[in-house]
Amino acid sequence: DFCLSRGLGDVYKRQVLYLLDGDSFFHSVVGFTRFFSSSKTSNLPPCIVVAVLNTDRTRDFTPTCSAARRDGTICPYDKPAGGGAEQFYRFLIEELRLEVENKVPANGTNFLVGHSYAGLFTLQTLSNHPESFDSYIAIDPSLWWDRGVFLQQAAKNVYQKDFSGKHLYVAFATRQRPAIKLIQFSLADSLKNKIIPEMKNKHLHVIYKKFPDEVHGTIALPAIFDGLKSLFHSTISTKEAT
């Protein structure tokens, strides 16, 4: 599903925003891009929003096959699932992007936006294939997956990457839920304190936010709005940001 956002600029060549879980957030995000692309407070140019739909989020967005729960425990009767993120990445780049660029006036600048499992996929794509997109917006990424396997993998490969010219906005819902045991909060701190500094050393521009009034199920839209606002604020040139 495609929608051309309105605004000033070259109507023939536009940036493309790939929105994972597009069936949930498509219309809202189209509204956000139309607002910012026509606002004097933003440098966001008119862009094309591509809603990316899938039939199995666990399979498509997770890096490993795992039975571990959100608190890190494993029950013997839970069946392992997931592990198809790299296959889905190849579909996204080798098939979907080619189809999009054959149908719409794209200019070669691309954004990837994801929440939850899709936020984890967004971070993994940045870590493994930073050249694939120009800006990444990862909302409350499911770092707990497979007992924090993403952080383990990222710690090994970020040293080999160059993130020059790339931008990451990452946000976490930090409202406490006492009845639920999670390893997510400690992993989010590890991302901030260990992985992100190494990515910055490799020239990645990072904006890290916490939303203390939001939980996992409510953070997506306010954080996507804030991500677009923060990355494209009119007083900041994203080409010069460090």
Can you say where each PLM-predicted feature lies in the sequence?
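Short glycine-enriched nucleophile-adjacent loop
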Residues: 33, 119-130
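Alpha/beta-hydrolase fold nucleophile elbow
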Residues: 104-116, 136
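Cell-envelope and extracellular/periplasmic
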Residues: 19-25, 101, 126-127, 135-141, ...
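Mobile cap/lid helix-loop segments that gate and shape the active-site cleft of serine hydrolases
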Residues: 128-165
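Alpha/beta-hydrolase-fold catalytic nucleophile elbow
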Residues: 52-53, 113-115, 139-140, 171
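Serine-hydrolase catalytic machinery in alpha/beta-hydrolase-like enzymes
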Residues: 16-91, 95, 99, 103
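Single conserved hydrophobic/aromatic residue that forms the stacking wall/gate
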Residues: 1-12
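C-terminal catalytic histidine-bearing segment of alpha/beta-hydrolase fold enzymes
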Residues: 171, 176-179, 185-192, 196-242
